[in-house]
Amino acid sequence: MNYTIIGTGAIGGFYGGRLMNAGRKVQFLLHSDYSFVRSHGLQIDSCDGSFHLDNVDCYDSTSKMPCADVILVGLKSTNNHLLKDLLSPIVGSNTTVVLIQNGIGLEEDLQQLFPGLAIIAGLAFICSSKIGPGHISHQCYGSINLGNYSCPDDRFQDILKDMQDAGITAAEVPYDEARWKKAVWNMPFNGMTVALNTSTDKLLGNPSTRRLIYEQMMEVINAAQALGVKGLDSSFADKMIEMTDAMVPYSPSMKLDFDNHRPMEIPYLYSRPISEARKVGFDMSKLAMLEAELQFIQDSYLKK
């Protein structure tokens, strides 16, 4: 199978780079880095072993790309309004799209745009950032959970195996469980680092915010349980706290968007899960308050 990477940044660049480094045929869509990567390749600095990729098959428009077997979407969900135009030229009858994005409801919305498309949710547990043109810094972790939304199982298993063969710690997790498990970490830490203008280690180093982070995690878990999602209980919140304690001090993607005055992923990270929970009578009150704070913060710099 050949792979196409849409969004060659901290996430797409890392996973696409690992696949290419393992010998898979991979093509990359680039924007501002196109000329640089075409001339100089991709550099992945990784805690698991750094590598450089020369002769990268890169494009500046999907209209110039051949149809893909598998498309990995690593764009921020704030750009999902572009997906119909981006994907239409490269989606064939047997194409699978893996949405490596944060939030709830992403696959449902993409399926409405492409009713027959095979879709997989990709939930990355990784600390990585783009630090320069064609230059990715992978600091720690790097696993990915795949949740099958609408993909034939044999194709799903082939993609899972390709990732594992490329040295990626990839696992199959039931779709709803995969999405909500990632939300347990994302909803507290992304928003709180913005609202308090801080980093993950400082949030957990203070007893008051450590307790609040845990309470927010349990709110996500309780919402998921109210929606019938299996595989989530308080032990998972404990695991996420323990994992974050062991991380290098980290600014999540939403904090970087805030720092650079870009739109934040509020709709899919907050508004959608809060709305879904309300439909079954569960009020995510602490996270709804955080959502309102984030909206105020974003409006203060986007509407100037």
Which role fits each region the language model picked out?
Residues 1-53:
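NAD(P)+-binding Rossmann beta1-loop-alpha1 motif at the extreme N-terminus of oxidoreductases
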Residues 3, 25-27, 97, 119, ...:
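Hydrophobic anchor at the start of a short beta-strand
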Residues 28-30, 146, 274:
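Short internal beta-strands
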Residues 32-36, 78-79, 104-105, 154, ...:
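Short alpha-helical
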Residues 50-135:
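Rossmann-like NAD(P)(H) cofactor-binding subdomain of soluble oxidoreductases
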Residues 89-90, 112-118, 133-188, 192-232:
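Internal alpha-helical scaffold of NAD(P)-dependent oxidoreductase catalytic cores
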Residues 164, 214-304:
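NAD(P)-dependent Rossmann-like dehydrogenase/reductase catalytic/cofactor-binding core
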